[in-house]
Amino acid sequence: MDELQDVQLTEIKPLLNDKNGTRNFQDFDCQEHDIETPHGMVHVTIRGLPKGNRPVILTYHDIGLNHKSCFNTFFNFEDMQEITQHFAVCHVDAPGQQEAAPSFPTGYQYPTMDELAEMLPPVLTHLSMKSIIGIGVGAGAYILSRFALNHPELVEGLVLINIDPCAKGWIDWAASKLSGLTTNVVDIILAHHFGQEELQANLDLIQTYRLHIAQDINQENLQLFLGSYNGRRDLEIERPILGQNDNRLKTLKCSTLLVVGDNSPAVEAVVECNSRLDPINTTLLKMADCGGLPQVVQPGKLTEAFKYFLQGMGYIPSASMTRLARSRTHSTSSSIGSGESPFSRSVTSNQSDGTQESCESPDVLDRHQTMEVSC
């Protein structure tokens, strides 16, 4: 394989300003389906056509969002077209969270998080999809992880943004951080997505999502989805012990990329998840100068990381990968964990003097530790 070139990546396109924020939420060339499952109806949006035996990229959004507000800025980003031309994309909306969704009838029992995960196999069967590469954010990351634990044969890879593997996570934390005791679900959701610094500094972005959550998402249905997420079980995943082959161990078997912004309220939860996963097939990506929605605020960086991830799985090997600057932190937890990682080289950039130190990932590095990169 030709040596990958590493250069500094900077975001070059403004996002979610008054001119293009709405446009980036739009779907282009998509087909919508309502699919019946044992746990109720689910709304999906298909983008592109399946490519032979390749997996489909399947997304699942976070609470307070739908596939449009969670993922369309990312998938409409110009550089993502290099990926989407090779893969069909299936966006899944949690029940009642899609645009213009009607309210559920009185007494409706919303699916649990486990049941939401079990709605996915009938979706794949209905659409004749054999396997997926999942991209989930927050609650969606939890659902896709549960799905992968229950059906490992259907999942080739996972990109998990802001995942919390624990039974109690950010919602309790977010509510306690708000001034006073509030029952405003919009404020709770905003505190779930964004840290205090971002809430105060990125006012345009916050206002865009405040209006979206309040006006575009059915509030009764949102309360039900929020309640389901608050009632989630611990994923109960365990990190394998080096040299011990225990098939009873509960862990993600597929290639996994964990993503979190360094200013996100989810940092501790993602680090906790990383500590429980198999370091052989897990990469932790911390995105600098980024808050709670990296796929919205820094789509260029995430696109480049996703390209590396897919290349590590054997897909799109000819993709242009020259923009992502990767740095290896100096803590012991940041050592490269596997020669099979999609990131085969690491670069530490010294911003003060402009020098770069190239660091290979040969066998001399500690293979018992997860690879951690930052960009």
Swiss-Prot record:
Residues 326-375 are annotated as: Disordered. The modification N-acetylmethionine is found at M1. Residues 364-375 have a biased composition (Basic and acidic residues). One of its GO terms (cellular component) is cytoplasm. GO terms for biological process: decidualization; signal transduction. Gene3D superfamilies: alpha/beta hydrolase. The keyword Acetylation applies. Keywords: Acetylation, Phosphoprotein. The modification Phosphoserine is found at S331, S334, S335, S338, S341, S352, S361, S374. Residues 330-346 have a biased composition (Low complexity). The keyword Lipid metabolism does not apply. Residues 347-359 have a biased composition (Polar residues). The modification Phosphothreonine is found at T322, T329, T332, T355. PANTHER family: N-MYC DOWNSTREAM REGULATED. Belongs to the NDRG family. This is Protein NDRG3. The gene is Ndrg3.
